[in-house]
């Protein structure tokens, strides 16, 4: 309707100018009565004593001249969207002197005068869209008095509907308060904003025009608090000194909006430069966008940009050179470019702490080597070992501790690991280990699942490699099999798989074995547990091989930070978890290589660079995190099969490098509850740099190459190159690996947040003169309890009637019931309604006299994110005044 009316208005004005080229001015009108009724009275020529005021107009020269003028009265459109902001409703001829008084002196024009000089043809075109809807007709009427009679009679018969339509189409008010509150309460802002908004071409909101008016002219003029009537508003507008500057302001608005569009496009381009190219998680992406826009548009930079684009300086700004993007810190851009790019990440953001030491030893070679075939009895598994359950471990270590109190071994798994790490016969180790083995060897500790029980085994002589040689069937009958391609060779390697547990613990150790990580011993082989969630099952052999090659490249790149790496010769062993066994009636033809439906599981093992060892679990955790970041950058390989990878921590498990954690050995099985064997870790050949794969496969079935704390043949061979017996080479011991820029987006985001006082408890006690628990009891808890009653179900509110408070840290107060330890979950209804939920209050202060208290809970249920803290509500409290 607005578009049709606007077109009619333009044609009407052209017709009037052809007939009588009078100067025409548009004015926003208002009446002290009901504008819709008065407008209807004008159109129906009904007697009325009403008058019309000019609230704003587009005559900026303060001079109309002699003769007559054509005045077009307008009303604000209720929903203009992108169309005209005010629409014409009346057009009439007016004496120049009366028009001068109407526009510039605030004198109203009587309705009778308007009726006498009304332009009937123009008015009919103004309201043709509304009348065609009311009469359900689109007939073209004639002009002149006949047309006016037709218009008059139509509106007369449909007066009620016409008045309602006018009220829906136009913003009609009976006082100037809407105008003042919308366009500004000072003279300068009101005149500039209202004139530009209603009568000039622009594409912006009133808020934008208000901001630009303050940039255009800092002086405000008089306050409009005394303007109470349309007469006052009309007088103020017509006599304002800023009316003549509206064209200048309109030109500035055009320049400023064009500059803002240029700057906005430049900022978006700068942000999207990294946004679309880097593998960012959703959290990192949010932080990155926040930081980018904050650097461009923070208060200080925005004020600087506003100063450089004010009316005095905007013409001097280079037209095609953005200003705001220059505010982005070059260091921030450089860090983004290098941190999320594989080629520069390791070089610029990873730091390694190391020193050179003599006598760095892991497992004793005798403990992981096979005994004589006769001693082994031709079988597999452990040849010399001690095994027992938890109670046996406790009894053994208790006896040793009674005989050797200086050993200070704890009677649990940790003590067993400490005992296994002892190997110096000249010290206390010999005497401590006498009850186990004749030689005090540094030996591994394994976990074995047997008869639905967990056994811990300390092994000092092992025949596991012989068992693997019998279980793994190589394509030796094929001539030249050593030179096959990796993928083809993988398909030709078969296993004599077992289905059930074996009859003796010694034999079971050959099919079910997990190595415990021992922080008392240095690490020589990097063992990685790789689990990649899959979008859907069905991976081809070539796809899995491509993933392995990509991961191999990342592993070798990370190892290159620790020492020299020959990428062609350095072995990286891959062992893929066997797919679920097919159903008996499932056809084999067309079956993909990998049918794993939940995840792709790999065990990845590689020796550290020559002469390098790692002590402690922290560097290994850091390496796994770094590798996770590297792997997540492989957009082309992994994103299609695992769309959620950017938001995950990564496919590598970082929790296997702590005391008491173990990882399953290659070529072994998982044992299910029915004592069945499943998920065999099968060899997956991936050694593209070598034409001879026989040595690679042989080493992949050698125990010393697959354990955390044993020196592999490759490591020892490289470490001894060029070293004389008189001057043995020292070992480079890595004690720390640090990603110096880890979480730098989060850290920089936190730096931009309001500063919090470091010790909320001290501030509260200092300002209130009470200890923290007393203040919480008397001041904070009543308000917290009020919110609990308001927002938490009644059946869970009663448990908070009698509580006590425990001061646990500088900003945490734990809430406990008077009876019992904890509460029932207040977030969800669990079937097991146990009182295991912790409730606590967190204190936060970033203002001198105010503290924010947040009620939080921790529920152990999986439905509540497994003990993840959850905030329920926050309340600000004044430390002085009524809250005190």
UniProtKB/Swiss-Prot annotation:
Organism expressing this protein natively: Equine herpesvirus 2 (strain 86/87)
Protein name per its UniProtKB record: DNA primase
Start-end of CHC2-type zinc fingers: 825-864
TM helices/strands, residue ranges: none
Family: Belongs to the herpesviridae DNA primase family.
GO cellular component, one term: host cell nucleus
GO molecular function: ATP binding; DNA-directed RNA polymerase activity; helicase activity; hydrolase activity; zinc ion binding
Subcellular location: Host nucleus
Function: Essential component of the helicase/primase complex. Unwinds the DNA at the replication forks and generates single-stranded DNA for both leading and lagging strand synthesis. The primase initiates primer synthesis and thereby produces large amount of short RNA primers on the lagging strand that the polymerase elongates using dNTPs.
Binding partners and assembly: Associates with the helicase and the primase-associated factor to form the helicase-primase factor.
Record Pfam families: Herpes_UL52
Source superkingdom: Viruses
EC number: 2.7.7.-
Lineage: Viruses, Duplodnaviria, Heunggongvirae, Peploviricota, Herviviricetes
